[in-house]
Design a protein with these regions (language model features):
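FAD-dependent oxidoreductase catalytic-site/capping-region signature
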Residues: 12-181
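Hydrophobic, small-residue-rich alpha-helical packing segments that form membrane-like cores
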Residues: 2-6
Length: 181
């Protein structure tokens, strides 16, 4: 989730500085996992080709790690050229929405601290109306959520008796003859 901020005109944005320089890892309130959330600021002093946020300034990205929502990926046919069915189901689990709401509010609280007084001109997104209640913030989150990492993943390896195993100990994909990973 991206929180967009307009910086003050006199705040120097260094076009040679890395866009990403630091990250905050923390455990969401009530989490049983350590570091299940991540927040990082990014500087946008120069345009990036295809970047959806053209204004100069900064943004804060809040990421839910160890999401409880689970998406779905399946083949529509055995034709390798046909697009597969993908449903990410972002924020489908209430706990993921709760954690992301908390992350957005942590960012907004950080921006109220004195070190940001000389940096932040105004909040661009979310707007005040989005912050009016959990319901309006959830609606905004669901409309604007996106994946924040490069797509990659792992599939469980295990015995035939393990329903969650996708491949056997030799990397053979279950249910697809002749396919190994």
């Amino acid at each position: 989730m991206v929180i967009r901020v307009k910086t003050k005109d006199d705040f120097p944005l260094d076009p040679d500085a890395p866009r990403l320089q630091t990250a905050l890892r923390y455990a969401a309130t009530g989490s049983e996992h350590r570091n299940d959330m991540q927040i990082f600021p990014s500087s946008f002093s120069t345009p990036l080709g295809g970047d959806p946020f053209p204004e100069e300034g900064i943004r804060f990205t809040c990421m839910v790690e160890l999401a409880q929502s689970a998406g779905e990926l399946r083949l529509n046919s055995n034709d390798p050229h046909e697009q597969m069915f993908i449903n990410c189901r972002y924020l489908e689990h209430p706990r993921d929405r709760e954690r992301l709401r908390e992350g957005v509010r942590i960012i907004l609280d950080m921006m109220e601290h004195e070190p940001f007084n000389g940096i932040v001109e105004e909040l661009i997104l979310p707007m005040e109306a989005h912050l009016a209640s959990d319901e309006t913030l959830d609606r905004w989150l669901l409309e604007n959520v996106w994946i924040g990492q490069h797509l990659s993943g792992t599939c469980k390896m295990g015995s035939d008796s393990d329903e969650m195993a996708v491949v056997d100990q030799y990397g053979r994909v279950r249910g697809v003859q002749g396919l190994r990973v």
